[in-house]
């Protein structure tokens, strides 16, 4: 068997086993002690469950995606020196097109508007 095929088979098998085990493990029932915040033995001064802006979270996720895009496209000049630079450029264009379509979708859904 090919080395890549073996690695892919091991990865898929390990993922399936771990996913199956996680579904079979019992869920622990939360009680008041587990749900209360712990602050080094002292009573909490305020609420530990602060409200979090979902808009901020979405903007942060978009930032991470486009930061990853830059990391993926940085080695592009070295990819031009390969035997098939057209294939490298095609993959880069596909990544850019996919991210652009995602950005357009997020924009049309109103995810980039901070205040309503």
Swiss-Prot record:
Pfam families: Oxidored_q4 (PF00507). It is an enzyme of class 7 (translocase). Gene3D superfamilies: NADH:ubiquinone/plastoquinone oxidoreductase, chain 3. The keyword Mitochondrion applies. It comes from the Eukaryota. One of its GO terms (cellular component) is mitochondrial membrane. It is a multi-pass membrane protein. Its main location: mitochondrion. Its EC number is 7.1.1.2. The chain crosses the membrane at residues 3-23, 56-76, 85-105. Core subunit of the mitochondrial membrane respiratory chain NADH dehydrogenase (Complex I) that is believed to belong to the minimal assembly required for catalysis. Complex I functions in the transfer of electrons from NADH to the respiratory chain. The immediate electron acceptor for the enzyme is believed to be ubiquinone. This is NADH-ubiquinone oxidoreductase chain 3. It comes from Salmo salar. The gene is MT-ND3.
């Amino acid at each position: 068997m090919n080395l890549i095929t073996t690695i892919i088979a091991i990865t898929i098998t390990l993922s399936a086993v771990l996913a199956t085990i996680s579904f079979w493990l019992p869920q622990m029932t939360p009680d008041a002690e587990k749900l209360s915040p712990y602050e080094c033995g002292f009573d909490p001064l305020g609420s530990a469950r602060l409200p979090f802006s979902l808009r901020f979270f979405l903007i942060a996720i978009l930032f991470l995606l486009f930061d990853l895009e830059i990391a993926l496209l940085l080695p592009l000049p070295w990819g031009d020196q390969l035997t098939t630079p057209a294939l490298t450029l095609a993959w880069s264009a596909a990544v850019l097109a996919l991210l652009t379509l995602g950005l357009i979708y997020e924009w049309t859904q109103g995810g980039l508007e901070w205040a309503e």
